[in-house]
Amino acid sequence: MNEAEHSVEHPPVQGSHVEGGVVEHPDAKDFGSAAALPADPTWFKHAVFYEVLVRAFFDASADGSGDLRGLIDRLDYLQWLGIDCIWLPPFYDSPLRDGGYDIRDFYKVLPEFGTVDDFVALVDAAHRRGIRIITDLVMNHTSESHPWFQESRRDPDGPYGDYYVWSDTSERYTDARIIFVDTEESNWSFDPVRRQFYWHRFFSHQPDLNYDNPAVQEAMIDVIRFWLGLGIDGFRLDAVPYLFEREGTNCENLPETHAFLKRVRKVVDDEFPGRVLLAEANQWPGDVVEYFGDPNTGGDECHMAFHFPLMPRIFMAVRRESRFPISEIIAQTPPIPDMAQWGIFLRNHDELTLEMVTDEERDYMYAEYAKDPRMKANVGIRRRLAPLLDNDRNQIELFTALLLSLPGSPVLYYGDEIGMGDVIWLGDRDGVRIPMQWTPDRNAGFSTANPGRLYLPPSQDPVYGYQAVNVEAQRDTSTSLLNFTRTMLAVRRRHPAFAVGAFQELGGSNPSVLAYVRQVAGDDGDTVLCVNNLSRFPQPIELDLQQWTNYTPVELTGHVEFPRIGQVPYLLTLPGHGFYWFQLTTHEVGAPPTCGGERRL
């Protein structure tokens, strides 16, 4: 293990500070930098991402909250699992009124998590294991306690007076929707110090930055340079559609936003090649595709973007036992530039958002997946994957197979690989942000602190609680969900078609079965056939596979040969919520690869 994982040799620089009315920030040169991974401009296309909350993963300091040193301690587990990149939500200094998305200092780590030096040690330790790290960057707004905002409200004519969107009236930009409809009545709030209204698309304690001010643009680019200079592999850009405001528009997806993102991309490409920008834009695919930029250049804005509308439709398709919700949203998704990639997910740290569905579809999802009102949050459902699926192992495996085989780079949420549950009586989104369940011991093996000091209580549910569901028990059980997930990740890694293959839906005779081919062309190409039964009952399917006549389907987890494809429709029968992954090959089949020395099914 590298020395950086154990010790910090010099005192940390303590973030930003105000001096003479000017906010001074540290420089990346004040710190060490992490070991670099080999340059690969397309690494993100092949990567499996793993979202982990620093606070929730492991507590190395025994104070009741997870920390950066705790995450370093658990990197060997993530390497064993087989993920390629860690996504860290905000770990910056914050009042924590919105889970860290209310940033008080972009240049400082929240003290209970550690220091910037600890963060550099984390990136270095991850890189030495072949794991990359991207972090959240909240570009749209700050906390009201950020020194930029405090100086802006104190001195309207000072250097920060125009850092935020101020107005004498709250009647501007009236066409902009209110995003947090369950807590906010307006996008404007009155500041008693400056005696003006300030604009906020999210909570009232999160004032929006004014990107019409060139100084704000430069300040954010400086933040980007700082963290990339320390060695991280990219950013998830939070809430990017809302950076600019214009009268007569909904203040989303504006041309000015795209122009600024092109500036950011150029800085990244010129100064930090191989780093990645991932857009969080909860919009329809036709709008989101614009965040990739110019297709004639391969894309000149963000390298990746989340495909939000796909996620609820996976849940809808399985509950309705019909492929059409998935088929239709994929058909509505425009082509993307050659150097771009979708990010797809089942669950994350927020609610299962239902913004990108119709009112009728939203009512259906609430009725099916959120029967208790406490399961709802804003316009969505605050539940983890396993409880959403009633802890049905077949459904969980089917959803995992869809996540790993549909177009895009998959994002796993910490704990879903073992089937963790949630605690719905906790407020806001905390119910899906509980401590990772490592062992059946006290505090789920997450912390040695007194249980009363934990940032949130672990689940003690008889089905999902840590005594029943934990890494220690599942790691030693070959048939566990954890080992199933690990095996599927290993299979995916061996076949580039899953990462970069073209997508061709096959239709078929049965609407309850979703079948598609992922294919990389060429002499060294790779063709994978994926067949998914969305019904709880066994289903037959006849597929037209004539273009692969004389190919042999080889099932990928067991390496079993199925009958050769001929001119007639190819008949398969799938168990309820079952799936197949086949490689279509004309070559002689060899011995199956193994995962970790043994083949786990």
From Swiss-Prot:
Region annotation (Disordered) maps to 1-21
The EC designation for this entry is: 3.2.1.1, 5.4.99.16
- Quickly give the catalysed reaction: D-maltose = alpha,alpha-trehalose; Endohydrolysis of (1->4)-alpha-D-glucosidic linkages in polysaccharides containing three or more (1->4)-alpha-linked D-glucose units
**Positions of Ca(2+) binding:** 140, 208, 242-243, 245
SUPFAM superfamilies in the record: (Trans)glycosidases, Glycosyl hydrolase domain
State how it assembles: Homohexamer.
Q: What else is known?
A: Was identified as a high-confidence drug target.
PANTHER family assigned to the protein according to its UniProt record, in alphabetical order: ALPHA-AMYLASE FAMILY MEMBER, MALTOSE ALPHA-D-GLUCOSYLTRANSFERASE
Q: What is this protein called?
A: Trehalose synthase/amylase TreS
GO biological process terms, alphabetically, are: capsule polysaccharide biosynthetic process; glycogen biosynthetic process; glycogen metabolic process; maltose metabolic process; polysaccharide catabolic process; trehalose biosynthetic process; trehalose metabolic process
First and last residue of the signal peptide? none
Similarity remark? Belongs to the glycosyl hydrolase 13 family. TreS subfamily.
Q: Record's Gene3D superfamilies?
A: Glycosidases (3.20.20.80), Golgi alpha-mannosidase II (2.60.40.1180), Oligo-1,6-glucosidase, Domain 2 (3.90.400.10)
Question: GO cellular-component terms in the record?
Answer: cytosol; plasma membrane
Pathway(s): Glycan biosynthesis; glycogen biosynthesis; Capsule biogenesis; capsule polysaccharide biosynthesis
In this protein, the active site sits at 238, 280
Positions binding substrate in this chain are 98, 141, 206, 236, 349-350
* Knockout consequences: Cells lacking this gene are as virulent as wild-type in mice, however also show a profound impact on intracellular and capsular glucan. It is not possible to inactivate Rv3032 in a mutant lacking treS, suggesting the joint essentiality of the different alpha-(1->4)-glucans biosynthesis pathways involving these two genes. Combined inactivation of glgM and treS results in absence of alpha-glucan.
Q: Which GO terms describe its molecular function?
A: alpha-amylase activity; beta-amylase activity; calcium ion binding; maltose alpha-D-glucosyltransferase activity
What gene, per UniProt, encodes this protein?
treS
List the source organism: Mycobacterium tuberculosis (strain ATCC 25618 / H37Rv)
Keywords of the record: Calcium, Capsule biogenesis/degradation, Carbohydrate metabolism, Glycogen biosynthesis, Glycogen metabolism, Glycosidase, Hydrolase, Isomerase, Metal-binding, Polysaccharide degradation
What does this protein's UniProt record list under function? Catalyzes the reversible interconversion of maltose and trehalose by transglucosylation. Also displays amylase activity, catalyzing the endohydrolysis of (1->4)-alpha-D-glucosidic linkages in glycogen and maltooligosaccharides such as maltoheptaose, to produce maltose which then can be converted to trehalose. TreS plays a key role in the utilization of trehalose for the production of glycogen and alpha-glucan via the TreS-Pep2 branch involved in the biosynthesis of maltose-1-phosphate (M1P). Might also function as a sensor and/or regulator of trehalose levels within the cell.
